[in-house]
């Protein structure tokens, strides 16, 4: 009996000491930012981290998901977060905070890794205690955990709203709801202003950034009193997420072509949405080149693109690479695909593909679609050799 009592007492003391150590780590970081939402959290986390680093903060950023990373102000090397076999656990945030403090940082920008509403509360109130909260968006996802309605998802995200701090949000149907919650917590609300994010600025990124992503990060800069010039420069210097959709300037600094790497967006809807966004930003899309990578073991996908994607992109030239291109050749010959010219490079080598491509790179968009594996991977590496170095000033 006494052994049980002593064991319980020891566990209690250890728990109290651990909590005190963690609170000491939290208190050692005057700037703590919690990025929550459904889509775009990793991008906003990276852009915000870039801003703080540019402004002179010793900042550590942390992204979550399948490729969770630690980002540091004092080295370009990112550290993958190694997880236990059971997967992500919000308790890892304690180790993140400890490492951040021991490294000498004075700011942390952390993507919220909790989905369950109760865990979101624990993440904010016990593990991070952010004084700046960011809610990227309220969309339908994880409905089984946070739903079943958008209203309940919005309610779950109120855990991100700090007390006596700042909340950065986009203007949405939940703006007034979040503002009321923030008022109850004596927190100032900053509405992200997309009018400050021009298409010309977005084209400077080598990956796809949406206006909301940049304006939310700019809102964090406003909360910290960081000037916009520093903020814009910091975002451009922020390293992209490994899974970011890359847009590379090619050949000429004055009239570059742009390679849009959409090979990994291997479904019709995503591929068309990317193309729509590329046009909206203002890239030279009047006479694009579409590169379709086909795979012998993905003939169903090739057929889907022949029916549901390529007919809806007016291309100057369509280049087919990889294997089993016949479904698209047939659709083109039947007049279903509005491309002015077709180049069927089935089974051709990367060098042979580049021989055709490099003469066509100036001042136009080259959009790679279909499949990332197979012929696309070595081609992407080769295209990178023609990348124009972006100057950030």
UniProtKB/Swiss-Prot annotation:
Disulfide bonds: none
Cellular component GO terms held in the UniProt record: membrane
Keywords assigned: Ligase
Phenotype upon gene inactivation: Cells do not produce PGA.
Assigned EC number: 6.3.2.-
UniProt cross-references to InterPro entries, sorted A to Z: Capsule_biosynth_CapB, Mur-like_cat_sf, Mur_ligase_cen, MurCDEF_pg_biosynth
Pfam families in UniProt: Mur_ligase_M
Enzyme class label: ligase
The keyword Ligase appears for this protein: yes
Record-linked SUPFAM superfamilies: MurD-like peptide ligases, catalytic domain
Keyword Membrane included in the entry's annotation: no
Cofactor(s) needed by this chain: Mn(2+)
One MF term in the entry's GO annotations: acid-amino acid ligase activity
N-terminal signal peptide: none
One GO-annotated biological process of the protein: capsule polysaccharide biosynthetic process
Stated role: Catalyzes the biosynthesis of PGA (gamma-polyglutamic acid) from L-glutamate. Both the 44-kDa and the 33-kDa forms are required for PGA synthesis.
Protein name: PGA synthase CapB
């Amino acid at each position: 009996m006494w052994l049980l009592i002593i064991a319980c007492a020891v566990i209690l003391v250890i728990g109290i000491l651990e909590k005190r150590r963690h609170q000491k780590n939290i208190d050692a970081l005057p700037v703590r930012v919690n990025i929550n939402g459904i889509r775009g959290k990793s991008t906003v986390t990276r852009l915000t981290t870039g801003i703080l680093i540019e402004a002179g903060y010793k900042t550590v950023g942390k992204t979550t998901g399948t490729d969770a990373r630690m980002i540091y102000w004092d080295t370009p090397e990112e550290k993958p977060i190694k997880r236990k076999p059971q997967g992500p656990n919000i308790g890892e945030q304690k180790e993140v905070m400890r490492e951040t403090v021991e490294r000498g940082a004075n700011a942390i920008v952390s993507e919220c890794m909790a989905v369950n509403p109760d865990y979101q509360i624990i993440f904010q109130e016990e593990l991070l205690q952010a004084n700046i909260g960011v809610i990227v968006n309220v969309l339908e996802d994880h409905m089984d955990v946070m739903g079943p309605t958008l209203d309940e998802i919005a309610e779950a995200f109120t855990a991100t709203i700090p007390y006596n701090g700042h909340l950065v949000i986009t203007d949405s149907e939940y703006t007034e709801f979040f503002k009321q919650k923030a008022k109850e917590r004596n927190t100032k609300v900053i509405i992200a202003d997309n009018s400050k994010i021009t298409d010309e600025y977005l084209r400077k990124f080598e990956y796809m950034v949406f206006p909301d992503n940049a304006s939310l990060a700019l809102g964090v800069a406003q909360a910290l009193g960081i000037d916009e010039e520093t903020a814009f420069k910091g975002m451009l210097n922020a390293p992209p997420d490994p899974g970011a959709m890359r847009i590379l300037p090619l050949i000429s600094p004055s009239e570059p072509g742009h390679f849009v790497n959409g090979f990994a967006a291997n479904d019709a809807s995503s591929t068309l949405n990317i193309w729509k966004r590329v046009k909206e930003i203002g890239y030279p899309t009047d006479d694009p080149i579409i590169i379709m990578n086909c795979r012998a073991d993905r003939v169903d996908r090739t057929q889907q693109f022949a029916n549901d994607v390529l007919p809806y992109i007016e291309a100057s030239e369509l280049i087919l690479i990889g294997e089993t291109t016949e479904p698209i050749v047939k659709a083109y010959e039947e007049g279903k695909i509005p491309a002015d010219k077709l180049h069927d490079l089935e089974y051709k080598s990367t060098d042979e593909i580049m021989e055709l491509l490099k003469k066509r790179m100036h001042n136009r968009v080259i959009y790679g679609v279909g499949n990332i594996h197979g012929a696309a991977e070595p081609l992407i590496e080769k295209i990178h050799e023609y990348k124009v170095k972006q100057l950030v000033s």
